[in-house]
Amino acid sequence: MSLKILKSIVNKIEKTCVYDIAIRTPLEKASNLSRKLDNNIFIKREDLQPIFSFKLRGAYVKIKNLIDKKKIKSIIAASAGNHAQGVAMSALKLGIKAIIVMPKTTPLIKVDAVKLLKAKVILHGDSYDDAYSY
């Protein structure tokens, strides 16, 4: 890959809408792992995001693009984890209604985290597949 192409890719990444909601997270050298593998290993610190996960990035970009194309006015998603929080936070930021369908077995801490982001939570079934089929 040429330096020109690489610079173009970096430029596109830096201008993406994802930074309307996500923070630029650092790369940190994993010293012990680097030493063990005799190589330089770096970890992208996505745990520093507002929902402690990279899932916010994909949810936000997808939802914003759908809104920009006037394809949605609200969103419904099935998830029991970080994706649920990413969708809820993205919807809140973008001013649309979010409904998150979660299995009844979802830990209360995850349910409460989604509710704090103003999404409506529907508990359905015992598994992700059950929630998804809702």
PLM features: what roles do these ranges have?
Residues 1-134:
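PLP-dependent amino-acid enzyme catalytic core
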